[in-house]
Amino acid sequence: MKPWAAFHLIFLVASSLEGEVSNYGTGGTQDTEPTCRTEHQCTRDKIILQSQPGIPGIPGVPGTNGSEGLKGDPGPQGPPGIRGPDGIRGEAGPKGDKGDQGDKGDKGDKGDKGEDCNLDGCLPTEVRNCQDLLEHGEILNGWYTIYPTKENPMVVFCDMETDGGGWLVFQRRQDGSVDFYLDWESYKKGFGKQESEFWLGNDKIHLLTSSGTQQLRIDLEDFEGSRTFAKYSSFSIGDENEKYRLIVGSYLDGSMNDSFRIHNGHSFSTKDRDNDTNKGNCAMMYKGAWWYFHCHHANLNGLYYKGKHANYADGINWRSGKGYYYSYKYADMKIRPQQSETTVS
């Protein structure tokens, strides 16, 4: 059926029914009951019949997108992932401050006895002096460790060349680089430089000369290169309580006359400890430290002058040598255990 034919059919039926309703309404008072018995919409005075669906229309134009919705709440935390590989180790940080010193630990067990010494330069504690070193094959001048007693190791200079070697040097002057006009405590402990001038120390000299007889040799050299020496049969000094009192034996021989034995029996004096027999302080008058009496014939710890000097007797003087107005360029004093035979040089 054509769409327009259906339209006309509906229109005719509707018009017919409307006429009936109107006639009944004018001819009596009986209510009008609907005559529709379909599931479609109806009223008391109209019946609308639905025809077949028409052809769908053309789709409309799509609408515009709506605005972005609000961000949702975070979801629940997921389970931990697997551990990743170790990263590259970073650079070391700066060194921290030194911590407090820890408590002292317990004393360890006593170690096993060591093996016998077989290394070069390894010397037994029986090496008491430079002569012992020479007998152990040490033939070079230099500083060595000796053991006058096992409890008292000592570093000393050994002259291994002069007069057969084995001499222990306890005093040396050679260039004026060290001040010898010092006090009692300095001479007690020792001072100076290993490579140049030094005084070994009265306490050490006492220890070295307190057992066995030690010969003494004094060597001098002037600024013209002339060398002289004097040798004595024995030499020792007392301890500090004895004021380091000098005990020197007989003059044996030498290329210069004796100017030292006259000091025998006298105490050691310094500028701050006057132990001489003079009314004044000989150490202060003659700018040294020595076994002064009233005052001296030798002053090997005096001021370092270069040869002749104007001041009286305050240089490195030797009365029977160059006298009181000439100071020597080089001086040393050294000891060696007494020997039955000695070689003079």
From Swiss-Prot:
UniProt GO molecular function: antigen binding; carbohydrate derivative binding; signaling receptor binding; toxin activity
Entries under Gene3D superfamilies matching the protein: Gamma Fibrinogen, chain A, domain 1
- An individual GO BP term: complement activation, lectin pathway
Q: How is it modified after translation?
A: Hydroxylated, possibly at Pro-80.
Biased composition, class Basic and acidic residues, residue ranges? 86-116
Query: Mind telling me which PROSITE patterns this protein's record contains?
Result: FIBRINOGEN_C_1, FIBRINOGEN_C_2
Give me the disulphide-bonded residues. Answer: C130-C158, C282-C295
Keywords from the named record? Complement system impairing toxin, Disulfide bond, Hemostasis impairing toxin, Hydroxylation, Secreted, Signal, Toxin
Q: Which residues form the Fibrinogen C-terminal domain?
A: 121-339
Query: Principal localization?
Result: secreted
* Highest taxon, organism lineage: Eukaryota
Would you tell me the Gene Ontology cellular component terms? extracellular space
Signal peptide (residue range): 1-19
Protein purpose: Initiates complement activation and/or interferes in platelet aggregation and/or blood coagulation.
Sequence similarity = Belongs to the ficolin lectin family. Veficolin subfamily.
User: What protein name is recorded for this chain?
Assistant: Ryncolin-1
Which organism's genome codes for this protein? Cerberus rynchops (Dog-faced water snake)
